[in-house]
């Protein structure tokens, strides 16, 4: 929805390779998101899980661009960055509230999945915790990123009545693989103010003006009961064959196949 001029220039420079490189970046981001979610919920994550996520992923053309070990390193170094982020913030009272949660509301024209909602201190010497919605980024920084955060935060707050759990700040957590000796991360924080929210709403209005009204469909209800028609079996008495009868049938088949 939000145009990224820098991304468009990159695609022009890379030409035919842009599609594969873009899908590789999406694959890395997907595995990072799933891996962090598992780490938060289970407390640990092993090399074998990442390797399995790579070899079972829907995108398998990565082997045209790098080796399995190189791809593993691209992912593991970003996970190292998240681990440092956690170790920095958790002792200061960080309390995760939700991880990888899909957000939808019938009164709002967009939907999405937020990566993390957490209680966190803005600075190490801050007295109070704030509620922050964080989005993990495994690529370059773009100035449009805070607008995506605002859209998710508005969805979250639409559902939350408890003032203590309503998002007041949003942040992009950038996780790269280019650090040398010490794993690094970058957390860019923005207050969720009216200015940020209105910027996104104006972009949404402009998009709708060009493309027509965007309607988010209500989720299809899950089936709760199954029935099959057995009326044609009313005169048949079902029974299980005993082992002896099965043995006789097998012998008959052997004789027929003779």
Enumerate the language-model features and the residues they cover:
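Cysteine-cluster motifs in flexible loop/terminal segments that predominantly coordinate metals
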Residues: 224-250
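Nucleic-acid nuclease catalytic cores
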Residues: 101-234
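Short hydrophobic alpha-helical module
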Residues: 38, 42, 85, 119-123
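Structured nucleic-acid-interacting core domains from mobile-element enzymes and related host factors
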Residues: 88-97
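Solvent-exposed amphipathic alpha-helical surface segments
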Residues: 39, 43, 89, 156-159, ...
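Nuclease catalytic cores
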Residues: 1-79, 96-101
């Amino acid at each position: 929805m939000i145009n990224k001029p820098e991304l468009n220039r990159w695609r022009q420079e890379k030409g035919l390779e842009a599609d594969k490189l873009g899908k590789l970046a999406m694959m890395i981001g997907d595995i990072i998101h799933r891996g962090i979610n598992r780490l938060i919920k289970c407390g640990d994550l092993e090399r074998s899980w990442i390797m399995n996520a790579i070899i079972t992923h829907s995108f398998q053309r990565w082997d045209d661009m790098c080796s399995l070990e190189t791809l593993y390193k691209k992912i593991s170094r970003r996970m190292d960055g998240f681990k440092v982020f956690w170790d920095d913030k958790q002792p200061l009272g960080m309390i995760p509230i939700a991880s990888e949660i899909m957000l939808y509301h019938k009164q709002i024209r967009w939907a999405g999945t937020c990566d993390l909602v957490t209680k966190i201190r803005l600075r190490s010497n801050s007295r109070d915790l704030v509620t922050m919605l964080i989005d993990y980024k495994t690529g370059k920084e773009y100035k449009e990123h805070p607008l995506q955060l605002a859209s998710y935060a508005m969805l979250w707050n639409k559902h939350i009545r408890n003032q203590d759990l309503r998002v007041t700040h949003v942040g992009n957590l950038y996780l790269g693989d280019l650090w040398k000796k010490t794993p690094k991360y970058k957390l860019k924080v923005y207050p969720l103010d009216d200015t940020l929210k209105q910027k996104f709403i104006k972009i949404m209005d402009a998009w709708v003006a060009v493309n027509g009204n965007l309607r988010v469909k209500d989720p299809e209800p899950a089936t709760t009961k199954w029935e099959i028609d057995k009326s044609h079996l009313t005169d048949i008495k079902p029974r299980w064959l005993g082992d002896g009868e099965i043995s006789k049938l097998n012998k008959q088949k052997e004789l027929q196949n003779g």
